[in-house]
Amino acid sequence: MTQPIIPRVGIASDAHQVEPGKPCWMAGLLFEDADGCEGHSDGDVVSHVIVDALLSASGLGDLGSFVGVGRKEYDGVSGERLITECRQLLAENGFTIGNVAAQMIGNRPKMGPRREEAERRLTELVGAPVSVSATTTDKMGFTGRGEGVAALATAVVWKAGA
């Protein structure tokens, strides 16, 4: 009798402060009508939270241990590169990605009109289905005041023979 493959689930959250004048990268897309988020990278909160959820599900650490804050080679790094390198790390460790669900929390950028485009791009990068949703906090808290953007993600992975 063969061993069943048991899925592993990871969750993650991330938040960044809005930085006026910085290009807005979110969910792998450039939003030219919104300010971006501060950070040592491109500030793509959705891409970051996807990486964090994948690392959580696989037990391979978190975004901080994966890229670190003080590593110069990751200054300004794109969310696309982070996802690509994370996907490679999971594959090297025998993991297959099942799917990812990510939710952006904030007033801007407006994800609704580009949600399907974001899902296509992230699905391509992750190599598995990615669903994207967005919500606001009805003017409450730092995201409601437009001071920042947050995101949540859940990822499902499995390891053959585990």
Swiss-Prot record:
* Swiss-Prot/TrEMBL catalytic activity: 4-CDP-2-C-methyl-D-erythritol 2-phosphate = 2-C-methyl-D-erythritol 2,4-cyclic diphosphate + CMP
- Report keywords, A-Z: Isoprene biosynthesis, Lyase, Metal-binding
Any one Gene Ontology BP term: terpenoid biosynthetic process
The prosthetic group or cofactor this protein requires is: a divalent metal cation
Q: Which residues bind a divalent metal cation?
A: D14, H16, H48
Task: List, alphabetically, the InterPro entries matched.
Answer: MECDP_synthase (IPR003526), MECDP_synthase_sf (IPR036571)
Q: How does it assemble?
A: Homotrimer.
What pathway or pathways are given for this protein in its record?
Answer: Isoprenoid biosynthesis; isopentenyl diphosphate biosynthesis via DXP pathway; isopentenyl diphosphate from 1-deoxy-D-xylulose 5-phosphate: step 4/6
One Pfam family name is: YgbB
Kindly provide the name given to this protein in its UniProt entry: 2-C-methyl-D-erythritol 2,4-cyclodiphosphate synthase
Q: Which residues bind 4-CDP-2-C-methyl-D-erythritol 2-phosphate?
A: D14, A15, H16, H40, S41, D62, L63, G64, T135, T136, T137, D138, F142, R145
Q: Is NAD there in the keyword field? A: no
Its ancestry begins with: Bacteria, Bacillati, Actinomycetota, Actinomycetes, Mycobacteriales
Which top-level enzyme class is recorded in the Swiss-Prot or TrEMBL entry?
A: lyase
Give the domain of life: Bacteria
| Role according to the record | Involved in the biosynthesis of isopentenyl diphosphate (IPP) and dimethylallyl diphosphate (DMAPP), two major building blocks of isoprenoid compounds. Catalyzes the conversion of 4-diphosphocytidyl-2-C-methyl-D-erythritol 2-phosphate (CDP-ME2P) to 2-C-methyl-D-erythritol 2,4-cyclodiphosphate (ME-CPP) with a corresponding release of cytidine 5-monophosphate (CMP).
Q: Where is this site: Transition state stabilizer?
A: H40, T136
Q: What is its EC number?
A: 4.6.1.12
Spans through the membrane: none
Question: What molecular functions are annotated in GO for this chain?
Answer: 2-C-methyl-D-erythritol 2,4-cyclodiphosphate synthase activity; metal ion binding
Protein family (similarity comment): Belongs to the IspF family.
Comment on bound cofactor: Binds 1 divalent metal cation per subunit.
